């Protein structure tokens, strides 16, 4: 069923003006990533991002919703003003589809790998080829090809899309629908990218950053990478 929904989305977008082939690259779901990045996947499953969709359910996060003037008893899982920041690829080819069976959408539920790194259909094969090249020939690959293909390296912008998208935001070009969870609701919503990304252990909102193997070389290198790699553990 999920393949049928994805195909329908692609067919529709193919007739929309201004939509290029590159923009039609599909979201693949987190399992396409964790087949290789299993250690990252395991720690992500315990994170707040993995459970983001659950917070839209009735009676979940009631205190926070009340402070933000939302109805804690309401089911927001189908609310188009909320869903986009709690699932992956909402409204995009291959992404989460409201109204579809959650069983079909299960690898797109929550803020997954592709929410930050971009639709895997654009660059997954390049990762596989580069890994094989390093393993078989001992050669590293240029990271620039990933940028050309569409992988996102501007992590801070990816975070700001939801965490700083409140009305009146001065740190992000906020656009409707705005998040109701602004700093005026509570200090915890004063999003700090550096602090959030550097958090380790049980409170990590994303996943543990493990030692990277040097499959790719060259720019761009996210500014936080060097710091994260200083004490990054080995993949399990």
Swiss-Prot record:
Kindly list the GO CC terms recorded for this protein: periplasmic space
Q: Where does heme 4 bind?
A: 49, 159, 162-163
Could you tell me what the cofactor note in this record states? Binds 4 heme groups per subunit.
Binding-site residues for heme 2, renumbered to this chain: 82, 85-86
Supply the alphabetized keyword list: Electron transport, Heme, Iron, Metal-binding, Periplasm, Signal, Transport
Report residues binding heme 3. Answer: 113, 116-117, 207
User: Which Gene Ontology terms cover its molecular function?
Assistant: metal ion binding
Q: Where in the cell is it found?
A: Periplasm
Explain the purpose of this protein.
Answer: Component of the perchlorate reductase that catalyzes the reduction of perchlorate to chlorite and allows anaerobic growth on perchlorate as the sole electron acceptor. The gamma subunit may be responsible for electron transfer to the beta subunit PcrB.
Could you tell me what this protein is called? Perchlorate reductase subunit gamma
Q: Which organism is it from?
A: Dechloromonas aromatica (strain RCB)
